[in-house]
């Protein structure tokens, strides 16, 4: 367990010093939010503004799938880690680093959303809960996409484009939650996550385990 915490700490440092994931997500999310407010009417903002911003956030997060293993693969640290800790812990560390960074980025922009979109505190809580569920699934899929690209090394950049369709059900649920403040839909999102998360972790672990043919 201690080794997992050490790996998560290392990944948080790597992803935010090298890839600047928190800074990038906050800036991109703010840009999408402010652009939405400036170019749309108040009615359209209330209907579609937040959903559009969430979609943009997920697109920006998917972009990290090609780099999450890049530095580890280039400097040989991935091979070293595989000889020291289990491949499952490496995948979990990647997942938690991306998920924690994404959550921090989301928390930073919540006050801006509260002001610009004129939402109540309850609506902000529903919004955070639903997007948080999406971030759980998207973080695992980003790791899976990164694992595929790391394993094949070439001509695998297209893999990231397959992530977005898997997130569509949760995006639809988020829209319904924001429209009706229906807490029960969050439990459906949890169920969707419970279906995809084990599959994503299993496939990612298998790919990383066999990348150097290490057993």
From Swiss-Prot:
Stretches that traverse the bilayer: 21-40, 50-69, 95-117, 122-144, 156-178, 183-205
Membrane topology: Multi-pass membrane protein
Organism ancestry: Bacteria, Pseudomonadati, Pseudomonadota, Alphaproteobacteria, Rickettsiales
InterPro entries: Cyt_c_biogenesis_CcmB
Cellular component per GO, a single term: plasma membrane
Family: Belongs to the CcmB/CycW/HelB family.
Record's keyword terms, sorted: Cell membrane, Membrane, Transmembrane, Transmembrane helix
Protein name stated in the entry: Uncharacterized protein RC0356
A GO biological-process term: cytochrome complex assembly
GO terms of molecular function: heme transmembrane transporter activity
Signal sequence segment: none
Predominant place of localization: membrane
Cellular location(s): Cell membrane
């Amino acid at each position: 367990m201690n080794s997992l915490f050490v790996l998560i700490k290392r990944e948080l440092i790597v992803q935010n010093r090298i890839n600047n994931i928190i800074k990038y997500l906050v800036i991109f999310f703010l840009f999408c939010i402010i652009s939405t407010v400036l170019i749309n009417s108040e009615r359209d903002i209330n209907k579609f503004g937040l959903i559009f911003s969430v979609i943009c956030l997920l697109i920006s997060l998917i972009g990290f799938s090609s780099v999450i293993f890049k530095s580890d693969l280039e400097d040989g640290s991935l091979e070293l880690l595989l000889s020291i800790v289990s491949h499952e812990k490496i995948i979990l560390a990647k997942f938690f680093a991306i998920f924690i960074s994404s959550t921090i980025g989301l928390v930073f922009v919540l006050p801006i959303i509260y002001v610009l979109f004129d939402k109540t505190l309850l609506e902000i809580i529903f919004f955070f809960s639903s997007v948080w569920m999406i971030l759980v699934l998207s973080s695992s899929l980003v790791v899976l996409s990164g694992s595929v690209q790391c394993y094949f090394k070439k001509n695998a950049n297209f893999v990231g484009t397959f992530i977005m369709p898997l997130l569509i059900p949760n995006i639809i649920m988020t829209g319904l939650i924001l429209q009706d403040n229906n807490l029960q839909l969050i439990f459906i999102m949890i169920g969707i996550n419970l279906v995809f998360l084990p599959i994503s972790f299993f496939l990612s672990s298998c790919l990383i385990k066999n990348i150097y043919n290490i057993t």
